[in-house]
Structures are given as C-alpha cells and as structure tokens.
Amino acid sequence: MNQTVELNYDMLADKGLRFANYLIDLVLQYGIGYLIGLVIGLMYKHLNVVAPYELITNMGGFGEVVFSYTIMLFYYFIFEATTQRSPAKFITGTKVITFEGEKPSAGTILKRTFCRMIPFNAFSFLGELGKGWHDTISDTYVINVKKYEEALQLKNSFEEIGSGIKE
C-alpha cells in the first residue's frame, strides 16, 4: 500500500484554517518569548545571573526583532522538520507536504521557515489559491489531513481492486 498520494487542490487547507494556524502559532511564539524572559528574570533575581538579564533588558528594538525571529525560526523548523506540523497545524488538522504528497526534507523546511521573514508573508496566503509565499518559494503545500487521508485510502482501495483483478 502506498503511503503518499499526489496532491489534489481540493486537499489544500482553506484560508480560515491558514489564518487560525497563523494566530495560534503566533500566540504560542509570544508565550515562548514570555517564558524565556521569565526564566531569565528568575535567574537574575534568585541566582544573580546578570548577563542574560542585561542582554534582554538592553537589546532595543532591533534586538527584539532578532529575538522574535530567532524564536520563530526554531519554532517552525523544529516542529515542521520533525512532524510536518506546527502545534497549530495539529490543532486544525493540517500538515505540510510536497506536491508528491511526501514529507518535505529538512532543507526544504529550513527554506520555508526563512521565507516566513519576508515582510507581509503572514498575509500572502489570502491570495487565490490560499498559498503563502513561504509555500510557493519552498514548493510546499499545507493540506487538510482528513481530506488527504481520504484520498490516500481511495487510492489504496483502487490499487487493491486492481491487484485482485490481475491474480
């Protein structure tokens, strides 16, 4: 039995799911940033570890952007390279695949993740096909897992029927 099926555009996650993914992941990334700040503050207060505290409190606007992008890069790369899904994609039942229906390589996920830093990328999925620039540039797709699995099951059923006829 095949474990992949070629992409059908009906399988693509709709714009509502894509927007939900964006919002959920954004909130979680802010939460991670908050937790990092909390840990640094507690280390400063209780253990007198000064260097990280001074770094965070004196970083300025550019430093805050670098800090945010660093969290974002690690967040998406770790989750999508290992599971094809960010936490939001688990919640909404979506995942990242290639056109052939396969798991993208780590290099492809890294490219996809860096493309998220393109200004206004977060809203680029609002176009006609619901594909963001980070999808288009990395040649990946965000699909509805349920629809994908239904198509895979149908394909495997036809293959079983076909193999039964040959025997």
Predicted features along the sequence, with ranges:
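Membrane-interfacial and juxtamembrane segments of integral membrane proteins
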Residues: 1-167
